[in-house]
Curated annotation (Swiss-Prot):
Organism per entry: Oryza sativa subsp. japonica
Cysteine pairs bridged by disulfides in the record: none
EC number(s) reported in the record: 1.14.11.-
Role played: Involved in the regulation of shoot development and salicylic acid (SA) homeostasis.
Record family assignment: Belongs to the iron/ascorbate-dependent oxidoreductase family.
Binding site for 2-oxoglutarate: R305, S307
Reported cofactor(s): Fe(2+); L-ascorbate
Molecular function GO labels: 2-oxoglutarate-dependent dioxygenase activity; metal ion binding
UniProt xrefs under PANTHER family: OXOGLUTARATE/IRON-DEPENDENT DIOXYGENASE
Full protein name: Probable 2-oxoglutarate-dependent dioxygenase SLC2
């Protein structure tokens, strides 16, 4: 399709109510498209390059050994969070099959009217079926549909469960079991991370707040794309919150930023493992010792990909900043981040800033070097 034709196509439906793209990528695929609609075509500089690097071999952490207080595994966890911001976790106890099966059925088998019941552009909605990444502000849309399930207080899962989709029949129980398993896993990993960081004074309070924190499950669907080299399933971003636990199927797609040259390495799915990554809040809490790393999703021309991300945060009203034990001006460890909360994040999402830099970047404090010049804190 010529560029002019794509541009004309992008304007169809503007100002006339619901456009076809607003119904999601799955609906576009069902309509039989053979070329990528203009709304999804990235500028040449932003398009994913052909694979030129081998799959990323993320650090592997064994939770069974971590539970046994193996100092080598605690050191491995610390190094992974510090150097990579990502790791693969084995022996985690999270039952993956039922959740992925239910997710596939939800996205691929249900007719549009059943899915459309939960469709919304409201980023604050607790249950939301949506498309793209931040569809109100995205200049170019992402090749992704998703189901968002938000639990504002993880102690009250039973209260929110009735609002979750009741079709297919096995989605709600599978999602509830998966959410509970991820909550337990998050608690264990946070205990280990606080130990590795040497956070003692506020450890108990933080863990209690983790138990009463929020959990957002994002069930992602990336259908097979007619021109995958022109678009992305998700643009480069970091995750809000403390930790994200990602369950993915066997189809490659997750890519992690590495080095200073803007390179991307695809993550090879490890059978039986979940992927865990550091979120913005944990980088802030650690005062920059741990890294919340940019990542993105590329799409496949032949196969659909499904993933389930469980993002864990403290309560929405909780203000978080660097742990006092990790800030010491006299020893060269200045405070590197402003305090933040969910309100600041939602305001950021609603602004135009989200199109060109990460939320974490907006919370960093510039420091004064010995030469008197202002420098970024990391």
């Amino acid at each position: 399709m010529a560029i002019l034709e794509r541009a004309e196509e992008a304007n169809i439906g503007e100002g006339s109510g619901s456009s076809e793209w607003e119904l999601g990528v799955r609906q576009l695929c069902d309509s039989g498209i053979t070329t990528l609609p203009a709304r999804y075509v990235l500028p040449p500089a932003d398009r994913p390059a052909r694979y030129v690097t081998p799959p990323a071999l993320l650090p592997v952490v064994d939770l069974a050994a971590l539970r046994a207080r193996d100092p080598c595994q605690l050191a491995a966890l610390h190094a992974a969070c510090r150097d990579y911001g990502f790791f693969q976790l084995l022996n985690h106890g999270v039952p993956p099959d039922a959740m992925l099966y239910a997710a596939r059925r939800f996205f691929f088998d249900l007719p549009l009217p059943a899915r459309k019941r939960y469709m919304s552009a409201d980023i604050r909605a607790a249950v939301r079926y949506g498309t793209s990444f931040n569809q109100l502000n995205d200049a170019v849309l992402s090749w992704r549909d998703f189901l968002k399930l938000l639990i504002r207080d993880t102690r009250r899962l039973a209260d929110v469960l009735p609002s979750w989709p009741d079709a297919p029949d096995d989605l709600r129980p599978a999602a509830a079991a998966y959410a509970t398993a991820c909550q337990r896993l998050f608690r264990e990993l946070m205990e280990a991370a606080l130990d590795a960081l040497g956070i003692v004074r506020c450890r108990r309070q933080l863990l209690e707040e983790c138990d009463a924190g929020s959990q957002m499950m994002m069930v992602n669907c990336f259908p097979a794309c007619p021109e995958p080299e022109l678009t992305l399933g998700m643009p480069p971003h970091s995750d809000y919150g403390l930790l994200t636990i990602l369950l993915q199927d066997e189809v490659r797609g997750l890519e992690v930023s590495y080095g200073d040259g803007g390179g991307w390495a695809v993550v090879e799915p490890l059978p039986g493992a979940v992927v865990v990554n550091v979120g913005d809040h944990l980088e802030i809490l650690s005062n920059g010792l741990y890294r919340s790393v940019l990542h993105r999703v590329r799409v496949n021309g032949r196969r659909a990909r499904v993933s389930v991300a469980s993002l864990h945060s403290l309560a929405a009203e909780r203000v978080i900043g660097p742990a006092a034990e990790l800030v010491d001006e006299q020893r060269g460890r200045p405070r590197r981040y402003m305090d933040t909360d969910m309100a600041a994040f939602l305001a950021y999402l609603a602004s135009a800033e989200g199109n060109h830099k990460s939320f974490l970047h907006s919370r960093r404090i510039n420091t004064i070097s010995s030469s008197g010049l202002t420098q970024p804190s990391n």
